[in-house]
Amino acid sequence: MGVGEKKESQKVAIITGASSGIGLECALMLLDQGYKVYALSRHATLCVALNHALCESVDIDVSDSNALKEVFSNISAKEKYCDVLINSAGYGVFGSVEDTPIEEVKKQFSVNFFALCEVVQFCLPLLKNKPHSKIFNLSSIAGRVSMLFLGHYSASKHALEAYSDALRLELKPFNVQVCLIEPGPVKSNWEKTAFSVENFESEDSLYALEVNAAKSFYSGVYQNALSPKAVAQKIVFLSMSQKIKARYLIGLKTQLLLALYQILPSSWYDSLFRLIVLKRKRDA
């Protein structure tokens, strides 16, 4: 087999948020499958697990437009196509809608939504060059059901859901598939970032007691959360499948929550959700 033939047979994946959690697990599994992986993350080169002959680690803040443009220019100089794009970069802002500073809201959307849009724009020329290429956007159950005191995170994921649906429609003529991955809680750095920081609410905030009760509840939920590996296995399996669905809800409890949201009247659901999340406050 000639060098050119080998190059054409090499599958290529680009992954954001690749140094931890779901992104890292996807990178490792695709490397095991023989993919050439471009691992993009703020600290990708510091991740020892990514030291692999087929992996090129790139340190980047995906919300930096100029850096992102340069990275994809370099990738495009080496690759003619991309088989799989996995958008896994993201984080959560926890707090009440009223008390969360607007600067934090803008940062939330910058990473979770606007940066992803730019990644897709830069990657599409490569994706269009490969039949049956796929884009996996990491959403959340919060993209379908807004969570108490995770309003801005939920809003960023709702935006991602609408964007992905539109993108899927637009890319159909180019044979580029778009898939939303909607897991429930996943054990990763996400909960550490969201729940370990000081609350935006002051002690005299009207939301302080409920915010602390919700934080305690969510932290407990993450003790029995899905593993990043379980979610990554689903993504990698789908990346090698010919046909995929528009979205995949991952986790039985997640499916139950969405079912309740869709079946119950909004007032009933709201009361039930608050009762469950704030139960520890009432017990105190």
From Swiss-Prot:
Q: Where does substrate bind?
A: 140
Q: Which InterPro entries match?
A: NAD(P)-bd_dom_sf (IPR036291), Sc_DH/Rdtase_CS (IPR020904), SDR_fam (IPR002347)
Q: Which GO terms describe its molecular function?
A: oxidoreductase activity
Q: Where is the active site?
A: 153 (proton acceptor)
Which E.C. number(s) belong to this protein?
A: 1.-.-.-
Q: Which domain of life is it from?
A: Bacteria
CDD domains hit by this protein:
17beta-HSD-like_SDR_c (cd05374)
Sites binding NAD(+) sit at 10-36
Give the family this protein belongs to, as stated in its UniProt record: Belongs to the short-chain dehydrogenases/reductases (SDR) family.
Name assigned to this protein: Probable short-chain type dehydrogenase/reductase VdlC
Organism, per UniProt? Helicobacter pylori (strain ATCC 700392 / 26695)
**Gene name per UniProt:** vdlC
